[in-house]
């Protein structure tokens, strides 16, 4: 028997065994990541969790993943250096946020006297030349909020919202969250906010930021002309907190933050975690500002001696790291999005029914929009979310309506959708 015939027989035997196993339901399957349901080899970082794939199979020395049994002295020093925490400035220089969208986001929490915290996903653009983030839309997913924290819940519409943003030419540029009033001298971000920001940067890139919206005590207008830090955005609800007076000026401020590349790397390794104390730790500023690390880290601080020489001084290793070492501040400005508005009802608000056709009718017939065409009226992110999750649910309709909203032109296609909606709203 020739070698060719032997190979053919072997292949036939393998095929027969595979068919037998297939009928028995015992065929081998490609192992998938539990979070993203994709093979681990498809990407080094899980797009769902933001962690490295196959962490349990990676060898960690210091703060570096090692793939060889032999490591050079320079690699060892670099691995040890990864365990020394150094503060770095933000890579993003400015965050511009649509004023209407961020004000509607915070106004609901302000109505609850800041006793129900919320978070939202930000969609916009990133300018590589100026290192600027533009936030054009704010979407609030399903979530459960409490006085000190919020917990994301599965959102059935999240995939559709992502498609709408992409069809409008937008991408995910970060997250926003609220928190109760706090003393910035004691705490800037708590560990949950730090991990939220880090996860966002790990999943969607370093062009993401965290916006925090909260009441803040500011110098009164009589004693000082400055009511905010440089680059800090003050929203419209300047007296949203109960008890606010002219003497004790309480404003609602919006600040932007970014975590360091080192923080993102440690998060991907799975070593940055919530402290053992859980949510109770959020009620104490000293505990809330500490993020837990599964391996001890040294904080490296630059000091200048009396003669002017700079040197690094490292503190003793610790598993509790102040979030200030991992975060940097970004200036914030408000602007009006030229792409979409954000005035329509939100799809998910606790204690409030979801929008219905009556709400859409009131919105479309509002006298403020009397001079607008149909294409201009539906150029609202939350109108599109409502239409494309409740009425027009196919991908073709999504692309068509988003194209109408983006161009704001009354094409024949736009007129057809207008006629359909008018018929539905008149019944």
Ranges and model annotations:
Residues 1-174, 178-315, 320-326, 332-338, ...:
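N-terminal beta-strand/alpha-helix entry module and adjacent surface
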Residues 359, 376-377:
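Basic, Gly/Ser/Thr-rich N-terminal segments that form RNA-phosphate-binding interfaces in CRISPR RAMP
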């Amino acid at each position: 028997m020739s070698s060719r015939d032997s190979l053919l027989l072997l292949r036939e035997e393998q095929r027969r065994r595979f068919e037998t196993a297939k009928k028995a339901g015992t065929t081998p399957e490609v192992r998938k990541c539990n979070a993203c349901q994709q093979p681990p080899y498809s990407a080094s970082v899980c797009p769902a969790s933001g962690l490295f794939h196959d962490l349990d199979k990676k060898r960690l020395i210091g703060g570096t993943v090692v793939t060889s049994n032999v490591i050079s002295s320079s690699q060892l020093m670099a691995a040890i250096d990864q365990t020394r925490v150094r503060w770095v400035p933000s890579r993003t220089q400015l965050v511009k946020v649509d004023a209407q969208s961020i004000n509607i986001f915070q106004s609901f929490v302000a109505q609850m006297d800041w006793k129900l915290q919320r978070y939202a996903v930000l969609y916009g653009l990133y300018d590589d030349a100026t290192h600027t983030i533009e936030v054009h839309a704010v979407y609030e997913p399903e979530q459960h909020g409490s006085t000190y924290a919020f917990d994301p819940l599965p959102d059935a519409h999240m995939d559709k919202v992502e498609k709408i943003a992409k069809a409008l030419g937008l991408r995910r540029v970060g997250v926003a969250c609220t928190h109760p009033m706090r003393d910035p001298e004691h705490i800037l971000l708590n560990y949950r906010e730090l991990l939220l920001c880090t996860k966002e940067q790990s999943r969607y890139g370093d062009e993401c930021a965290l916006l925090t919206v909260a009441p803040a005590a500011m110098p009164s207008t009589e004693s000082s002309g400055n009511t905010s830090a440089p680059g800090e955005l003050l929203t419209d609800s300047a007296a949203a907190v109960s008890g606010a007076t002219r003497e004790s000026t309480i404003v609602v401020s919006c600040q932007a933050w970014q975590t360091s590349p080192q923080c993102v790397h440690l998060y991907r390794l799975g070593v940055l975690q919530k402290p053992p104390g859980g949510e109770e730790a959020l009620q104490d500023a000293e505990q809330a500002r500490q993020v837990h690390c599964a391996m001890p880290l040294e904080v490296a601080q630059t000091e200048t001696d009396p003669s002017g020489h700079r040197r690094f001084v490292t503190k003793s290793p610790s598993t509790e790291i102040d979030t200030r070492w991992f975060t940097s501040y970004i200036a914030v400005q408000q602007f009006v999005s030229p792409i979409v508005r954000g005035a329509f009802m939100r799809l998910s608000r606790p204690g409030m029914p979801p929008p219905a056709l009556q709400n859409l009718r009131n919105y479309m017939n509002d006298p403020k929009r009397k001079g607008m065409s149909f294409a201009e009226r539906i150029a609202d992110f939350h109108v599109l979310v409502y239409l494309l999750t409740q009425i027009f649910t196919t991908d073709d309709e999504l692309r068509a309506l988003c194209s109408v909203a983006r161009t704001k032109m009354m094409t024949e296609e736009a007129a057809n959708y207008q006629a359909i909606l008018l018929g539905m709203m008149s019944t």
